[in-house]
Amino acid sequence: MTNIRKTHPLMKIVNNAFIDLPTPSNISSWWNFGSLLGLCLIMQILTGLFLAMHYTPDTTTAFSSVMHICRDVNYGWIIRYLHANGASMFFICLYAHIGRGLYYGSYIFQETWNIGVILLFTVMATAFVGYVLPWGQMSFWGATVITNLLSAIPYIGTTLVEWIWGGFSVDKATLTRFFAFHFILPFIILALTIVHLLFLHETGSNNPMGISSDMDKIPFHPYYTIKDILGALLLIMVLLMLTLFAPDLLGDPDNYTPANPLSTPAHIKPEWYFLFAYAILRSVPNKLGGVLALLLSILILLFIPLLHTSKQRSMMFRPFSQFLFWLLVADFLTLTWIGGQPVEYPYMVMGQLASILYFLLILVLMPMASLIENKLLKW
């Protein structure tokens, strides 16, 4: 008799995706981040759902409702901080997942990669609108500054900004619609994740060597389920340590001051995971130029498959490309640090240099290094 998991219409899908899935035998721990992102998404949806039960999306009561969750709701404080720090863990996993894709040439699976970039945009949008909800100072001014960037669009800019605001400033209408967006977007992310997996399972996983692994595949369960559980336990451990020992480590103290349109915080800055893009935005002296650079800093990922000039897929055997990759990682971290610094010398100059290097590495230096490595193969 055939096992029910192989015959039942629903269980068959789960079986082919998570149990009997043929997987390369040599994928490393860098391949853990996909499942960790799935775990993060589930945790965020669950904690978010419980927060939404007690939150009120109204300018007069939003801040108080968040404080009420922390003080009066049973275990509300831990739900709130798991949600806030869960977002940080989400982005750590996202950046590691993208870095893995860049290093090992996973972007050659173009459909999977492009859906991944769309997912990144959606997660960033969700995190941005979510940060506005507690209605603290940084929530309000962050929303004002970032939405205002759209006014740089010629001709329709101002109309567009006022349309998003639902008025002439960030106010009640803005908060209400941002809450609606923040509630619906995670489910869109969930749907996109399924499409992402669908495209991935059409081709099968890549592996560290970047060569076909058709001759050496093993079932996903138990080999990789146990490996994923280990990764999940480590992620949960880090998240719990962050939440229970230093819940406000990654947050901004300004957000404990209720939103006040009449007083601007000394330094307006987004959460740490947007700082690299914020640094690129600030590096361009022109408003429209800055907005375009900001967009391009993420959209550039879509061009990476087109910029692949190497005869090898993975960077495993390409020392020049490896050096440039780690230079890009260092540059990303530098931009993240600079994004959190005030707009003054020397940070401005460093930010401009780091921004130029960011685009130069991806668009020019890495494709050139690949061509040089191709030549070296013939020696």
Curated annotation (Swiss-Prot):
Where is this protein primarily located?
A: mitochondrion
InterPro entries according to UniProt:
Cyt_b/b6_C, Cyt_b/b6_C_sf, Cyt_b/b6_N, Cytb/b6-like_sf, Cytochrome_b, Cytochrome_b_C_euk/bac, Cytochrome_b_N_euk/bac, Di-haem_cyt_TM
Q: Which UniProt keywords apply?
A: Electron transport, Heme, Iron, Membrane, Metal-binding, Mitochondrion, Mitochondrion inner membrane, Respiratory chain, Transmembrane, Transmembrane helix, Transport, Ubiquinone
What does the entry's cofactor note say about binding and number? Binds 2 heme b groups non-covalently.
Coiled-coil spans are none
Name the residues that bind heme b b566. H97, H196
GO cellular component assignments = mitochondrial inner membrane; respiratory chain complex III
Which PROSITE patterns has this protein been placed in? CYTB_CTER (PS51003), CYTB_NTER (PS51002)
Question: Is Iron there in the keyword field?
Answer: yes
User: How does this protein sit in the membrane?
Assistant: Multi-pass membrane protein
Which cofactors are named for this entry? Answer: heme b
Q: Where does a ubiquinone bind?
A: H201
Q: Where are the transmembrane segments?
A: 33-53, 77-98, 113-133, 178-198, 226-246, 288-308, 320-340, 347-367
Q: Where does this protein hold heme b b562?
A: H83, H182
Give the superkingdom in one word: Eukaryota
Describe its assembly: The cytochrome bc1 complex contains 11 subunits: 3 respiratory subunits (MT-CYB, CYC1 and UQCRFS1), 2 core proteins (UQCRC1 and UQCRC2) and 6 low-molecular weight proteins (UQCRH/QCR6, UQCRB/QCR7, UQCRQ/QCR8, UQCR10/QCR9, UQCR11/QCR10 and a cleavage product of UQCRFS1). This cytochrome bc1 complex then forms a dimer.
Described by its record, this protein's role is as follows: Component of the ubiquinol-cytochrome c reductase complex (complex III or cytochrome b-c1 complex) that is part of the mitochondrial respiratory chain. The b-c1 complex mediates electron transfer from ubiquinol to cytochrome c. Contributes to the generation of a proton gradient across the mitochondrial membrane that is then used for ATP synthesis.
Query: What's the protein called, per UniProt?
Result: Cytochrome b
Source organism of this protein record: Mesoplodon peruvianus (Peruvian beaked whale)
Name of encoding gene: MT-CYB
